[in-house]
C-alpha cells in the first residue's frame, strides 16, 4: 500500500484511468522492469537480451492485416536497410531461423543445375553447400583449413574455372570464429566474374561487424534476430539487391516451394 500511495502522490497512477488505481504510468514500468536472475548466457546466439527489449515484447498482439500494423512493419523494413547500409534493397522479415535464409537463397536465386561457388571456413559453409545441393544446384567448395580462410588467389582461380550463378560467403563462421574479408572478395568477383551474384551469410556478423551491402555489391544478405541484432530468436531476416530481385523475376525453373518463395 505504501508503494501505491507514493505513486498516487507523484501522479503516476490515477483513479480515473481505465485501469483504475492499478494503471501505472509507462515510465514507471520501464524503469522498474527487470528480468529474473539467471545464469549469464555466453554463447554466440541466442545472446543476452536487454530488459528494455524484453519489455517491448510485452506489447499486445496486433492483427497483421490491420491498418495499425502497416506502419510498424514498414518502419521495421526501413530499419533493416539502415542496419545493412542498403537503401536500394528489398528487405524480408520471415518467421524462422537464420539458416532459413539459405533456403530462401536456394529457392529464389537459382535455376536447376546452376553452379554455385561456396567459400567454406567451417561447419556453416559446409551446411550451406548441402542446402544448395538439396535444391538441385551444384555447389563447388573452396575449403580453408580450420582456423584460416580461402586466399584471394584461391578464390580468383576458382571463379575462372567455370561460370557460377552465385558465390556464397559466411561472414563469420560460428564454429571457427573466422571472419571473411567480404569487401575484398566482392572486388574479386566484380573483376573476374561480374555476373555472379554475391550471397552473404551474416547470421553471426550483422549488427556486430561492418557491412555496406550496396557499396560492396552484396546481392543477398541473410541473418537472424538473436545475435548481433539483440532480440529474441524467431525471425529470419534478409535483404535482396535490385539485381537479385531481377534474377528472381526472370527465373524459368518451376517454383519448388510455397512458403519460401518470394511471390
Sequence positions of predicted segments:
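Active-site phosphate-binding strand-loop segment of PLP-dependent enzymes
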Residues: 149-205, 220
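N-terminal "arm"/small-domain region of PLP-dependent enzymes with the aminotransferase-like
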Residues: 28-67
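Conserved active-site segment immediately N-terminal to the catalytic lysine
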Residues: 214-226
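Conserved PLP-anchoring active-site segment centered on the Schiff-base-forming lysine
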Residues: 110-126
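Conserved N-terminal alpha-helix of the aminotransferase class I/II PLP-enzyme fold
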Residues: 56-104, 123, 127-133
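Active-site C-terminal subdomain of aminotransferase-like
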Residues: 48-49, 226-263
Amino acid at each position: 500500500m505504501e508503494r501505491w500511495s507514493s505513486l498516487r502522490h507523484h501522479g503516476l497512477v490515477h483513479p480515473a484511468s481505465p485501469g483504475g488505481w492499478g494503471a501505472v504510468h509507462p515510465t514507471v514500468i520501464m524503469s522498474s522492469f527487470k528480468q529474473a536472475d539467471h545464469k549469464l548466457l555466453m554463447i554466440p546466439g541466442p545472446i543476452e537480451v536487454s530488459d528494455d527489449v524484453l519489455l517491448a515484447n510485452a506489447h499486445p498482439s496486433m492483427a497483421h492485416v490491420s491498418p495499425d500494423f502497416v506502419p510498424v512493419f514498414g518502419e521495421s523494413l526501413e530499419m533493416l536497410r539502415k542496419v545493412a547500409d542498403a537503401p536500394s534493397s528489398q528487405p524480408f522479415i520471415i518467421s524462422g531461423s537464420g539458416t532459413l535464409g539459405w533456403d530462401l537463397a536456394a529457392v529464389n536465386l537459382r535455376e536447376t543445375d546452376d553452379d554455385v561457388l561456396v567459400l567454406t571456413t567451417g561447419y556453416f559453409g559446409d551446411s550451406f553447400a548441402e542446402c544448395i545441393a538439396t535444391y538441385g544446384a551444384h555447389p563447388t567448395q573452396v575449403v580453408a583449413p580450420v582456423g584460416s580462410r580461402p586466399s584471394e588467389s584461391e578464390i580468383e582461380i576458382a571463379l575462372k574455372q567455370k561460370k557460377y550463378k552465385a558465390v556464397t560467403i559466411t561472414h563469420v563462421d560460428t564454429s571457427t570464429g573466422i571472419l571473411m574479408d567480404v569487401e575484398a572478395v566482392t572486388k574479386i568477383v566484380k573483376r573476374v566474374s561480374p555476373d555472379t551474384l554475391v550471397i552473404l551469410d551474416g547470421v553471426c556478423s550483422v549488427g556486430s561487424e561492418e557491412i555496406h551491402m550496396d557499396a560492396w555489391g552484396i546481392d543477398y544478405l541473410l541473418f537472424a534476430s538473436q545475435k548481433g541484432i539483440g532480440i529474441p530468436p524467431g525471425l529470419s531476416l534478409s535483404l535482396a539487391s535490385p539485381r537479385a530481385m531481377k534474377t528472381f523475376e526472370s527465373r524459368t525453373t518451376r517454383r519448388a516451394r510455397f512458403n519460401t518463395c518470394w511471390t
